[in-house]
Amino acid sequence: MAAVAMTPNPVQTLQEEAVCAICLDYFTDPVSIGCGHNFCRVCVTQLWGGEDEEDRDELDREEEEEDGEEEEVEAVGAGAGWDTPMRDEDYEGDMEEEVEEEEEGVFWTSGMSRSSWDNMDYVWEEEDEEEDLDYYLGDMEEEDLRGEDEEDEEEVLEEVEEEDLDPVTPLPPPPAPRRCFTCPQCRKSFPRRSFRPNLQLANMVQVIRQMHPTPGRGSRVTDQGICPKHQEALKLFCEVDEEAICVVCRESRSHKQHSVVPLEEVVQEYKAKLQGHVEPLRKHLEAVQKMKAKEERRVTELKSQMKSELAAVASEFGRLTRFLAEEQAGLERRLREMHEAQLGRAGAAASRLAEQAAQLSRLLAEAQERSQQGGLRLLQDIKETFNRCEEVQLQPPEVWSPDPCQPHSHDFLTDAIVRKMSRMFCQAARVDLTLDPDTAHPALMLSPDRRGVRLAERRQEVADHPKRFSADCCVLGAQGFRSGRHYWEVEVGGRRGWAVGAARESTHHKEKVGPGGSSVGSGDASSSRHHHRRRRLHLPQQPLLQREVWCVGTNGKRYQAQSSTEQTLLSPSEKPRRFGVYLDYEAGRLGFYNAETLAHVHTFSAAFLGERVFPFFRVLSKGTRIKLCP
């Protein structure tokens, strides 16, 4: 199909061949020049006539320079006494000889300029056949004539010297340099301007004009473009200025000394260079498109992740807002009840004090009145009065003092809110765990309810299992997780040496894992001492990349977090005795918290790779115990 598409249109090609390369229109009175190319008679005449004008300007400048030199010579001759004028008869004799030489074929004279000969249009007739033959054979006869002209010139000069003794007589001007006429298409040069009519081409153009009145706009000439200065086809390319030019621009002074090649050759060369860049550019484009598609997918994923995270944040804060509102309402209700009870007690105490004050006021008035009396009236029932006064006792009111553990205290509120928030956030994800005995190291002993583990007094005889840890004292939880959020709490106790966390299902159970280096193997003294020394130096036995475990633990002195990609020393403000472990499978996060204060301890960014993740526990020394909290 490509070959068919590249086949030229015969009609279009025929139209192109009938177009003049100068005027870009159908031939009008076509003529052929010596190289075989055809042009309109008017076009080629005007083109070569324009070249004559440039040559004529140059000749005029040369004549002016020669006239100036002659005037200087005459001035010198006059100063030397050589002022004898040239005789008219001698000059006329010279002119006659020059006319005779012109008739013999000399192309330059003193009376007629060369341009007048050049401007004459030559039409090949029968009598010019012999002269044309000489031209195509190399113009040999013309060279012979030039030799004869030189001999005649020498004879004329000798006669002038004999007849005229004036040494400053001006000599005839030297012959002007022969100019060449150039074909606008192939750039072939000719010594003179000559062309012949092409009648067959004129007839063909008439037929083509009847078929198509105007030249095709899709022709090569139209594709080449038009020179904006000379209105001619741009068929050449200047390699110096790197621009397309026409045949007239080629002869101008701005491009005459430049390297010029046909435009079609440059087009083909540049096409080849462009084709060489096509394949690398195509590969680069494919690579960029792949990267662009990858980045677009990444942007889409990031946007989706951002939306989901924003929704999760909004949901969590919504829960938090509702929780705080509920807690606020409950605390306010309890505070009102407490204050109402306190107000009741205070009111009752005030009533009792008012009644006591009234009794004291009456007794005081009676005592004052009796003290004013005398005689028998004073002594009447005096003992009863004394008894009543002595029986009076001051009863201070009950003073209410706020209890720091009551709900209205700041510390109580903070503690209550923190604890309830922790329960709120962990309640939905909290799981009830048990330990898997098939994974427990033989040196470990599990509690009957499978919620606690410690080091046994001696190595136990247990059946070998593919999942059992044999190189380190570790055990996994019985429940594994492949998605979702999960929370569990672990209580640790004892002197030192424990680790809690999570592990992928593909963990190497036969290799040593966890922070602090290797663990107790068989439990003998040498192994224990060797293990203790390694723990102290924090030298892991196996490469971290083989562990697939994320855990937080201690060797009794330092807390550290260790995974397949990091080993970080921790400095918690308090030594946690109860750890909360929070697993977010989709987010790839495993967080550790102080379950008592909810203080953050450490968070891992993990890659679970679609595997199940199990709770992980490790015991390093006797007296250390780990217990799962319900």
From Swiss-Prot:
GO terms for cellular component: cytosol; fibrillar center; intracellular membrane-bounded organelle; nuclear body; nucleoplasm. Expressed in multiple tissues with the highest levels in heart and skeletal muscle. Signal peptide: none annotated. Pathway: Protein modification; protein ubiquitination. GO terms for molecular function: identical protein binding; ubiquitin protein ligase activity; zinc ion binding. Zn(2+) binds at C227, H230, C249, H255. A zinc finger (RING-type) spans 20-61. The modification Phosphoserine is found at S447. Induction: Down-regulated by muramyl-dipeptide and lipopolysaccharide. Residues 413-630 form the B30.2/SPRY domain. SUPFAM superfamilies: B-box zinc-binding domain, Concanavalin A-like lectins/glucanases, RING/U-box. Keywords: Coiled coil, Cytoplasm, Isopeptide bond, Metal-binding, Nucleus, Phosphoprotein, Transferase, Ubl conjugation, Ubl conjugation pathway, Zinc, Zinc-finger. Interacts with PRKCA. Interacts with NOD2. Interacts with TRIM17; this interaction prevents TRIM41 activity on ZSCAN2. Belongs to the TRIM/RBCC family. PANTHER family: E3 UBIQUITIN-PROTEIN LIGASE TRIM (PTHR24103). This is E3 ubiquitin-protein ligase TRIM41. The gene is TRIM41.
